[in-house]
Amino acid sequence: MVLLHVKRSDKDTFLFDTPAATEVDVVLREVVAIHNLRQKIGRLAAQVEGLAAHGPMKVPEQQGLDDETPLLEDYDVKDGTTKARAPPERGAHFCPDPSERRTGNAPSPELAAVLTKTVEDAKALASERQVQMKVATTQKALADAVGNIRGAVMIAYPMGLPDYDAVRQILEEREAVDGAAGLEELEIEKASLWCFNKELQREKLLSEYVGKNDKSKVMHLHRKAISKQNETTKKN
C-alpha cells in the first residue's frame, strides 16, 4: 500500500491510500471522484448553513429583493400606479437574510442545530486538516456525509424544499456549477496526476512511479488544459 498526498493547492489537498499495484487510471478516477465530492460538500455546506439560519430560498424572481420592493406584476401599465406588496408570512423563528436570497423563515433552533452539526461533521471529513492528522479520505466516507446531510434536511423539512432551492438542487445533482466553483470541478477525461515532474500514464501501474513501499508520495492533480510546471514531491 502507498499513501498518496493529493494536492491541487495548499488548501485543496487530501490523503488517499491505495495498493501500489493499482492501475493509474483506477487511481485517477477515484481521486477525481474524491476531489469533486470534497468540492460538493463545500458548496452544500454553505447552502445548508444558510438554510439553517434563514430558511428556504425565495422564488427566483424575488431573490435579492427586500419584501417591500415592487415586483413586475405590481405595476399597472395602464395608469402607471404600483400596488403595495402584501407582507409575506413570517414563521415563529423568523431571521431575515441579509442577502435577501432566503425567506427568513428559519427552522426551530433544535432542527437548525441538527443541520449545523451534520454540516460540521461533513466539513471535517473534507477538510485539509485530515492531512495533518494523517487520515486518508475515501469516496464512501464523503458520499455517506452527503447522505447524512440529505437526511438532516429531510428531518428539518419533511415536506421537502422548493424545487429552486440550492440545497435541493445540489442534493439532486441539478445545480449549475459555474464561475469559480465550475473551475474546481474536474472531469476524468481532462484530469491528470503528476509525480516527480512526470505525468502518470493511465495504462501503467502506480508502482512504476512510486515504488512499493508505504512512504507518502505527493501527487499533483491537474486539469489537462492547464499547462503548469509541477513541483517535485517529498517523501515523509
Task: Cite the ranges covered by each PLM segment.
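Ubiquitin system architectures
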Residues: M1-N236
